[in-house]
């Protein structure tokens, strides 16, 4: 997986070094995030590249829906390496709401009561991932987990609930990818395009926030 991603990212860096302005920036969300970040640093240590995972921000969005507030009103303390991380504190307009969230997540996972979900994370496997957080939160009381902790701590359950004949990759190709490719085909054919098919949810918002900063 990592080897499949590293070479194209290094190639992209080389293209930018050759063709882009010296002030270029690459905002990279490719996975596996930690491996790609380490590889690009070792192979191209002077590259102007930000290797980022948006999952903590996606979880913040769900926290905001659970609390009934705007995501930007939350302030969080988070530590860890990319997907392997924990929220130690969550504050809403300065008020500590960590314990309230712990109680909720231990019972419901990161699924809001209305089950509203970001279009980028609305596939069945994502909904299962958000719900799985309740098991981790119940077992580890000190902090709120990143959803990816399920792969480290609930490995057997993840394997048992997986369908080898219809994986998360199939969900992406049949859902998000198909919506975008169909919209592009409609645009090229001169048809009216539903721009919401290009909406990236919190993932897209975070990319814009990083680029603007």
What are these regions (language model features)?
Residues 38-42, 62-63, 88-90:
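Short acidic, glycine/serine/threonine-rich loops at helix termini
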Residues 1-44:
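Rossmann-fold NAD(P)-binding glycine/threonine-rich loop
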Residues 1-8, 51, 55, 202:
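Catalytic cores of large soluble enzymes that bind and process phosphate-bearing ligands
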Residues 46-63, 67:
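Acidic, His- and aromatic-enriched active-site or binding-groove loops in soluble protein domains
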Residues 33-37, 59, 85:
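Flexible loop/turn segments at secondary-structure boundaries
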Residues 24, 47-48, 74:
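A structural micro-motif
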Residues 65-213:
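Long, compositionally biased stretches enriched for glycine and/or charged residues
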Residues 26-29, 51-52, 78:
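A structural signal for short, well-ordered beta-strand segments and their strand-loop junctions
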């Amino acid at each position: 997986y990592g080897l499949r991603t590293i070479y194209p990212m290094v190639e992209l860096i080389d293209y930018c070094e050759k063709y882009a302005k010296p002030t270029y920036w690459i905002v990279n969300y490719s996975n596996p995030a930690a491996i790609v970040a380490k590889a690009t640093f070792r192979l191209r240590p002077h590259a102007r590249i930000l290797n980022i995972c948006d999952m903590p921000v996606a979880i913040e969005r769900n926290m905001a829906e659970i609390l009934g507030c705007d995501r930007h009103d939350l302030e969080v303390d988070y530590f860890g390496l990319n997907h392997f991380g924990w929220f130690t504190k969550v504050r809403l307009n300065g008020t500590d709401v960590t314990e309230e969230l712990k109680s909720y997540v231990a019972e419901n996972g990161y699924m809001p009561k209305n089950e509203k979900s970001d279009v980028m994370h609305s596939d069945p496997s994502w909904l299962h991932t958000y719900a799985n957080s309740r098991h981790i939160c119940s077992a580890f009381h000190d902090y709120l987990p990143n959803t990816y902790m399920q792969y480290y701590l609930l490995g057997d359950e993840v394997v048992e609930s997986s369908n080898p004949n219809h994986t998360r990759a199939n969900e992406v190709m049949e859902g998000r990818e198909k919506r975008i490719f169909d919209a592009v085909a409609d645009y090229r054919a001169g048809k009216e395009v539903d721009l919401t098919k290009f909406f990236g949810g919190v993932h897209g918002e975070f990319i814009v926030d990083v680029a603007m900063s």
